[in-house]
Swiss-Prot record:
One cellular-component annotation, GO: small ribosomal subunit
GO biological process: translation
Stored InterPro entries: Ribosomal_uS7, Ribosomal_uS7_bac/org-type, Ribosomal_uS7_CS, Ribosomal_uS7_dom, Ribosomal_uS7_dom_sf
Its job: One of the primary rRNA binding proteins, it binds directly to 16S rRNA where it nucleates assembly of the head domain of the 30S subunit. Is located at the subunit interface close to the decoding center, probably blocks exit of the E-site tRNA.
Gene Ontology MF terms in the entry: rRNA binding; structural constituent of ribosome; tRNA binding
Name of the protein this chain belongs to: Small ribosomal subunit protein uS7
Naturally occurring in which organism (per UniProt): Methylorubrum populi (strain ATCC BAA-705 / NCIMB 13946 / BJ001) (Methylobacterium populi)
PROSITE patterns with a match to the protein in the record: RIBOSOMAL_S7
Keyword Lyase: no
CDD domains for the chain: uS7_Bacteria
SUPFAM superfamilies: Ribosomal protein S7 (SSF47973)
Subunit structure, as described in the record: Part of the 30S ribosomal subunit. Contacts proteins S9 and S11.
The entry's keywords: Ribonucleoprotein, Ribosomal protein, RNA-binding, rRNA-binding, tRNA-binding
Similarity annotation: Belongs to the universal ribosomal protein uS7 family.
Taxonomic classification: Bacteria, Pseudomonadati, Pseudomonadota, Alphaproteobacteria, Hyphomicrobiales
Amino acid sequence: MSRRHSAEKREIIPDAKYGDVVLTKFMNSIMYEGKKSTAERIVYGAFDLVESRARANPIEVFRAALDNVAPAIEVRSRRVGGATYQVPVEVRTERRQALAIRWLIQAARGRNDRTMVERLSAELLDAANNRGNAVKKREDTHRMAEANRAFSHYRW
């Protein structure tokens, strides 16, 4: 990691349909090999399914899902005198959002439905209702932090 120059933050353009910057980040995370139109089709298709199944605004469901998946605390390894401790630390806001997006997509890809549209919509609905693998991942992270609470004084 360079000490001299840090990478400058690029401006992310809000998506065309809902005008949401976080949704654009979500699409960019879903995207493979630069195929943005495919990622858009997947996300918008999933949102249409969410709207028809839940009879709710898909953006609200998406925000609720992200809030339910975002971790407040995580463990980081810290080496002290030959021993490695898992030290619980708070998660910065940007990293919270990035982890929530990453975990939602991983959980959706790990589901058994036929298409990615169906998998993503099911995972979004589950996460919005505090169920599903993405929420389980957050719970596991919090459990690890709670178990290693004794090492919190090693925080840096």
